[in-house]
Swiss-Prot record:
Organism: Helicobacter pylori (strain J99 / ATCC 700824) (Campylobacter pylori J99)
Protein family: Belongs to the acyl carrier protein (ACP) family.
Any GO BP annotation: lipid A biosynthetic process
GO CC annotations on file: cytosol; membrane
One Pfam family per UniProt: PP-binding
O-(pantetheine 4'-phosphoryl)serine, modified sites: 36
Cellular location(s): Cytoplasm
Function: Carrier of the growing fatty acid chain in fatty acid biosynthesis.
InterPro entries assigned: ACP, ACP-like_sf, PKS_PP-bd, PP-bd_ACP, Ppantetheine_attach_site
Lineage: Bacteria, Pseudomonadati, Campylobacterota, Epsilonproteobacteria, Campylobacterales
Keywords, ordered alphabetically: Cytoplasm, Fatty acid biosynthesis, Fatty acid metabolism, Lipid biosynthesis, Lipid metabolism, Phosphopantetheine, Phosphoprotein
Full protein name: Acyl carrier protein
């Protein structure tokens, strides 16, 4: 599950939270204390780290860590 660990590290760094808090069910705003700007910056960091593009309409649907993992798994090799 190296992908999850990579994503977890990016999220923990971007949101300045302990990696243990970054679980698949953790919601960025509700559980990790992110605001809308934090979420935008997080999406940009994930795009850069994984060399993908997350369109705005997809980014709006990403509310928790599991959503990010699924999106990257589904689109990284596309």
């Amino acid at each position: 599950m190296a992908l999850f660990e990579d994503i977890q590290a990016v999220i923990a760094e971007q949101l300045n939270v302990d990696a243990a808090q970054v679980t698949p069910e953790a919601e960025f705003v509700k559980d990790l204390g992110a605001d809308s700007l934090d979420v935008v910056e997080l999406i940009m960091a994930l795009e850069e780290k994984f060399n993908i593009e997350i369109p705005d309409e997809q980014a709006e649907k990403i509310v928790n860590v599991g959503d990010v993992v699924k999106y990257i798994e589904d689109n990284k090799l596309a």
